[in-house]
Design a protein with these regions (language model features):
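Membrane-lumen/periplasm interface segments of specific transmembrane helices
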Residues: 264, 270-371, 462-467, 471
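Hydrophobic/aromatic-rich transmembrane helices and adjacent perimembrane loops
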Residues: 115-116, 224, 231, 364, ...
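Hydrophobic, aromatic-rich transmembrane alpha-helices
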Residues: 63-65, 69, 189-195, 277-286, ...
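Signature aromatic-anchored transmembrane alpha helix within multi-pass, membrane-resident enzymes
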Residues: 81-90, 296-305, 393, 424, ...
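Transmembrane alpha-helix segments characteristic
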Residues: 16-23, 83-96, 215, 260, ...
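Transmembrane-helix signature of polytopic, membrane-embedded enzymes
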Residues: 86-87, 192-219, 235-236, 249-255, ...
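Membrane-interface alpha helices of multi-pass inner-membrane proteins
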Residues: 171, 197, 211-216, 239-244, ...
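Interfacial juxtamembrane loops and adjacent helix segments
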Residues: 124-166, 170, 324-338
């Protein structure tokens, strides 16, 4: 290890390589068997697919170790610190391209489709879509009803189950026909906010460049940034919330509350609640904290009432349209079911959370979590570092009490709302926060030397080029295979496609429709050949079966 003379570089390389190799072996070993260990199929499959990603991370560590003296990586980081807008613009263009070419402008999972569906409704100026009530079980698989999409079995009204903040953000893009551009824009804005947070912490442009590129180069930011998940919105909202409270004033507290209320209602309140709790305690306990906390609450209230309480009541009304007797107990029953989401973790949940931490590791720049842990420890005297550490730990620990794994998703979705803590704390291992200046004659900390910074910069640049490139190839293949699980019919006429999920992987997720069944294709989920034929004869007598394969049947007038 002749190129790694500094203790910081040796420590970062050896620890990074050992942990990455352990994750590689874990994923590889599980891939050899069929035991899912109580995990959902999608979560299990995506974890064993991280085996080659971990191998790639090892190669990047090796490349950075031997290549850092020869790469202009440090100059790139320095330039990025001075040109954040240029970096964010490049990121926006790459993410927009990825949303179309890599992600195929496709809501892959039901979490994505629910927000996509509701944004179409909002873009049309409505609160709910409408399906023919007798066909609901074909148009929305029964297990998805009132879980992802609320339905009225009396009227056929349909709206997303989650709170609608992200769907509202997506709606203008949907109206303009560029829904795929929403998350790339949110992700690019997040880069600018993280750069600004780093300047507040370190007052150093190179440090801000490290925080910026540690974020941009992590594949999880790319993958979520080209998707239809609400996670980029959570990350941006929480980052802005923190930025507003770095130097709290009454006006900034009101603004932080307003941003926080949007974060609470993006799709569910747990991500922001866990992130924001340490900040609220800190604001309340500082001098003048009562006034600041009052202003924060005032900022939270309007959108929480409108989107939070309002959507809760609207959803209850939709669910019980035409069922007057049940409506009296609807709200209390739904509130009780919402609270039941928290429970003590069992073995499967603990395992899922440990896998989540492993996924956070392999979907980031190699060594990022080591640096973040070191930064949290070494800079613990800085109040902002303590707050970011508390938010990260509370988010990480809080989800141990949510009794489901994340199913589909890139990286560890449940941590993404607090993900900005990692590059900021990692940078705190490389640079000292301005609030904790170096004491006279004190030795340099483990990772503060220039050689370690060169090594980290090389990891950043190699991951940006090769790590994201590899993950983009993986994601594109996964989404393309998913899209291929429909009948391979070439016609474009008006038709009904009935999907048979027996030969597909999460084929029910492909039953995606316009809120009013506009367009040339209606998708349904098969209830068996006899039931499908009976349905078609009753409601679409003019259509005949024109195509069939293992993925389903196609019905049209052709």
């Amino acid at each position: 290890m002749s190129h790694a003379r500094s203790a910081g570089t040796r420590t970062l390389f050896l620890l990074g390589a050992m942990v990455t190799a352990a994750i590689l072996l874990w994923a590889y070993q599980w891939g050899l068997g069929t035991n899912r260990h109580g995990l959902s199929a999608s979560f299990f499959v995506l974890f064993i697919n991280d085996y080659p990603g971990a191998a790639f991370a090892l190669l990047i560590l090796m490349g950075a170790l031997f290549g850092s003296p020869h790469l202009p990586a440090r100059r790139v980081v320095h330039w990025a610190g001075h040109q954040p807008l240029a970096i964010a613009t490049v990121a926006l263009l790459l993410l927009a391209l990825g949303a179309v070419v890599v992600y195929h402008n496709h809501p892959l999972a039901m979490d994505e489709y629910a927000a996509n569906f509701q944004s179409r409704v909002f873009a049309a100026g409505e609160l709910h879509g409408t399906f023919p009530a007798p066909q609901l079980d074909w148009l929305i698989p029964r297990g998805f009803q009132d879980y992802f999409l609320n339905v009225s079995r009396a009227t056929g009204s349909v709206a997303e189950t989650y709170w609608p903040g992200f769907a509202l953000l997506l709606a203008p893009f949907m109206w303009a026909g560029v829904a795929w551009l929403c998350n790339p824009i949110l992700s690019a804005l997040t880069l600018l906010v993280i750069h600004r947070l780093a300047l507040e912490l370190f007052d150093d442009r190179e440090a801000a460049g490290f925080a910026l590129l540690l974020t941009m180069s992590s594949p999880v930011i790319f993958a979520n940034g080209i998707s239809y998940y609400s996670m980029p919105a959570h990350l941006l909202a929480n980052s802005v919330f923190a930025l507003l409270l770095v130097r709290p004033t009454p006006f900034r507290a009101v603004a932080a509350g307003a941003v926080g209320s949007l974060a609470l209602t993006l799709h569910n309140p747990v991500p922001h609640t866990l992130f924001a709790a340490p900040w609220l305690v800190w604001v309340a306990t500082r001098p003048g904290g009562v006034k600041l906390l009052t202003m924060l609450i005032a900022g939270y209230l309007p959108l929480c009432v409108l989107l939070g309480l309002g959507w809760f009541l609207f959803s209850g009304h939709l669910l019980h349209e035409g069922l007057a007797a049940a409506a009296q107990t609807a709200s209390s029953d739904r509130l009780h079911s919402m609270l039941k989401i928290f429970s003590l973790p069992d073995t499967a949940v603990v395992l899922a959370r440990l896998i989540g931490i492993a996924k956070t590791w392999v979907w980031a720049v190699p060594g990022l979590l080591i640096l973040a842990a070191a930064g949290a420890l070494l800079s613990r005297r800085d109040v902002l570092c303590r707050l970011f550490t508390a938010s990260a730990l509370l988010t990480l620990c809080g989800y141990f009490f949510v009794p489901v794994d994340q199913g589909h998703g890139w990286g560890y979705r449940y941590f993404h709302s607090a993900w900005m803590t990692l590059p900021l704390l990692a940078t705190a291992a490389l640079f000292r926060p301005t609030r904790t200046p170096r004491e006279a004659n004190s030795p340099a900390r483990l990772f503060e030397d220039n050689e370690t910074k060169d090594f980290v910069a090389a990891c950043v640049i190699l991951t940006l080029v090769f790590g994201i490139g590899f993950r983009a190839w993986q994601v594109q293949g996964f989404v393309a295979r998913d899209l291929g699980q429909v009948p391979q019919y070439k016609g474009t006429e008006k038709r009904v496609v009935i999907l048979d999920g027996r030969s597909s992987f999460y084929g029910a997720d492909l039953v995606q429709n316009d809120p009013w069944l506009r367009g040339n294709e209606i998708r349904m989920y098969s209830h068996g050949a006899a039931a499908d034929e009976k349905l078609m004869a009753q409601y679409y007598p003019e259509l005949r079966r024109v195509y069939a394969d293992r993925y389903g049947t196609v019905w049209s007038v052709k």
